[in-house]
Amino acid sequence: MAKKRANGEGNIRKRADGRWEGRYTAGYHPETGKRIIKNVLGKTQAECKAKLSAAMEATRGIDVSRADEYTVATWLRSWYEIYAKPNIRISTANRYQLMVEQYTIPRIGSIKLTKLTAHDLQKLYKDLMENGRIDRKSGHGNPGLSSTTVRSLHLMLHSALERAVKERLILRNPTEDCIAPKVQKIEMQILPPEHIKDYLEAADRRGLLPMFYLELVTGLRKGEITALLWSDLDTLNKTISVSKQYVKNPNGELTLSRPKTETSVRKISIPQDAIDLLITEHSKHPENPYMFPSPATGEMYYPDSVVNLHKKILKDAGLPHIRFHDLRHTFATLALQNGVDVKTVSSMLGHYDAGFTLRTYTHATRQKQDEAAQTMGSFMARVM
């Protein structure tokens, strides 16, 4: 007969097959009120007792009736739809969906949520770093995801599992015990001032001077410059309005959304030369609403197509490779080095904080600090 454990901690009995079984109340069904009974097995009474104690500790404070419903896959999908998607930007939601459906669920989705461990997650990170890429050319390049992408996935999982803790589905967030990969910082590059003329001449030969001239005097993100409409240009006040961007969802489709942050919705002053170029560009397609429609389709450029055009311009000009995003860095660096204050540059870039701009472009402000030091040194020499 069953042996009652002390303090109501469960029952242990020896089964007919010789093994020991421990049974305990894990919770109560929310509708029927009936006890939810679970069990553990052991070869010896001591082993069974230890397993029973561990199992009861693991369920203490957990809503077992709900926790048992979830695997990693079902919880991540539920969290994404209910908590994440309604409260984040479209581009972030698209990235989360990709990380949930393509990177995480195929590898650990079948694990019960209550059984997920830090070890499972650490193995996931390792596998993604080594074999995580979905679309890659056979035999070429690194098949793994970047440390930046895997760290982003770690942060997403931390958020999802933290919600599971608050919902009393798991006792502790297993990401707390993980070692997230260190981000390998990409060295910032710019288009040197002595290369700008060659670059723009190459762009002009391809009929792309207005777009890439505007990029160099504004530092727009690729999704922002492709989403510009002719109506975004104010020729009287010499500004362009940035209020939208095109981003790619996990299915490869383009989606129009608000820019990266609220501070990314902005008006940017542009020089008269840029306005003149834009007016000339618009005269080629006066009925088209887009600032830079694709000659092939008449629709807006696919953002990655603009990146490819940038690569062709560099090749035409015989210039070393830099990323399209480095044109944004070029604008910021040259503006700061030529005396534009950091707050103005920050607002033009759409950064949430001038401090972020300052930290990002320390190399540019260092030159101005050196000049300031020399100025003050000369002043002090005169007065002493």
Model region roles, listed by residue range:
Residues K182, I190, Q245-K248, I275, ...:
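Catalytic-site neighborhood detector that most strongly recognizes the C-terminal catalytic loop/helix
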